Curated annotation (Swiss-Prot):
Protein name: Adenylate kinase
Group of enzyme by EC: transferase
Annotated localization: Cytoplasm
Reported function: Catalyzes the reversible transfer of the terminal phosphate group between ATP and AMP. Plays an important role in cellular energy homeostasis and in adenine nucleotide metabolism.
Pathway: Purine metabolism; AMP biosynthesis via salvage pathway; AMP from ADP: step 1/1
Annotated source species: Rickettsia canadensis (strain McKiel)
Residues where AMP binds: R36, E57, L58, I59, G85, Y86, P87, R88, Q92, R157, R168
Length: 212
């Protein structure tokens, strides 16, 4: 099974991607995580990518396409996967279809801009296990202690400022809305209400994918 999660940054794709991937026993591939890993390396490619991220701009198609193709052609992904954050535009979708022959399902996370900004501004994660929290909506049960692993070290994304987020949303809409129209005619396009809480969204996705 190949499932694509579409939606603006902070819509909940990563959280749901990890959960659903575990349920159906396939890898979760998050393009944002891949590029954040690259940025931590001391390479010219990392510096180039980091410049786009800091300015709230989308990374050029040719860079994104090559990175994601290298991942997906690995034997690790031959039995399917959940793809989070790719493709983002028509050019990327057409590139994806040029080397992927399996049927796919596309799930779009529809969410209000105001809620999206709060979700992104408040987002942080445990450095040890990666559990995601939010200073507005989801704090650890014990202050500064991860619910999952007990670590007290957390990671706050420095690129998540309100100005950058608003620019990212604007760029996303310009780039991705034509892609949504394209996929709507595929017969395999579904919309979930990203403004619902985490558990409700998970249930909606499970119904779409016909899993328990």
């Amino acid at each position: 099974m190949i499932v694509i999660f579409l939606g603006p940054p902070g819509a909940g794709k990563g959280t749901q991607g990890k959960k659903i991937a575990k349920k159906i026993n396939v890898p979760h591939i998050a393009i944002g995580d891949i590029f954040r890993t690259i940025i931590k390396t001391s390479t010219s490619e990392a510096e180039l990518i980091n410049n786009y991220v800091r300015q709230g701009e989308l990374i050029p198609n040719e860079i994104v396409n090559q990175v994601i193709k290298n991942f997906l052609l690995s034997s690790e992904y031959k039995n399917g996967y959940i793809l989070d954050g790719y493709p983002r535009n028509l050019e990327q979708a057409q590139f994806f279809e040029s080397f992927i022959t399996e049927k796919i399902k596309i799930i779009y996370f529809d969410i209000l801009d105001e809620l999206l900004i709060k979700r992104v501004l408040g987002r942080y994660s445990c450095k040890n296990c990666g559990k995601i929290y939010n200073s507005y909506f989801l704090q650890p049960k014990t202050d500064s202690v991860c619910d999952v692993c007990g670590s007290s070290t957390f990671d706050y994304r420095k690129d998540d400022t309100e100005e950058v987020i608003k620019k990212r949303i604007k760029v996303y809409k310009t780039e991705t809305y034509p892609l949504i129209d394209y996929y709507k005619n595929s017969g395999h396009f579904y919309i979930v209400n990203g403004s619902k809480n985490e558990q409700e969204i998970e249930i909606d996705i499970q119904k779409i994918l016909k899993i328990n």
